[in-house]
A protein has these predicted regions:
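Sec-dependent bacterial lipoprotein signal peptides
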Residues: 1-17
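N-terminal helix-cap/turn-to-beta initiation motif at the start of protein domains
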Residues: 17-31
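Exposed, flexible binding/inhibitory loops of compact, secreted disulfide-stabilized domains
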Residues: 27, 33, 44-52, 71
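Contiguous, well-ordered beta-strand patches that form the walls/edges
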Residues: 36-44, 56-120
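Short, low-complexity, Pro/Ser/Thr/Gly-rich segments in the mature regions of secreted, periplasmic
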Residues: 126-135
């Protein structure tokens, strides 16, 4: 009986150590599908991914020369803030604004309004573009 009780306590202890998602339906890996600019131009995206977990966002362009960048992520109310992007593997090197453009980001500190977020799709809008994502 004592062994069963210890086993149950051990299992409860292990399961309580998991980090719960703090960003709701935004947490996870997302593929950027389109960037709709305010001037009417629509850009179809090819192999651009956002990975969101806790207070970090990783953006990466696979198969191109966009590289991978890691930044700070904050989600409050219906607003997302992404900032302080650095090159993955060389954290001393800040990401330039030109390097952020293929990801639909145009500022060092990006504020986006979450228009809609389900478990499968999300739409975010900034002052320059509307980003459409699908869960990956």
């Amino acid at each position: 009986m004592k062994q069963i009780l210890l086993f149950i306590l051990f299992m409860l202890g292990i399961s309580s150590c998991d980090k719960a998602p703090i960003n709701g339906k935004l947490d996870g890996r997302w593929q950027l599908m389109t960037i709709e600019y305010t001037n009417g131009k629509i850009e179809e995206c090819n192999r651009i991914y956002y990975s969101i977990q806790l207070h970090l966002v990783e953006i990466s362009a696979k198969g191109g020369n966009g590289g991978t960048h890691i930044g700070r992520f904050s989600y409050k109310g219906d607003e997302v803030t992404m900032s302080e992007f650095r090159h993955r593997g060389d954290e001393e090197k800040l990401t330039t604004l030109n390097e952020l453009k293929p990801f639909g980001l145009n500022q060092a500190i990006n504020h986006l309004k979450v228009e809609k977020a389900t478990g499968k799709k999300q739409f975010q809008k900034s002052d320059c573009a509307r980003l459409t994502f699908r869960k990956f």
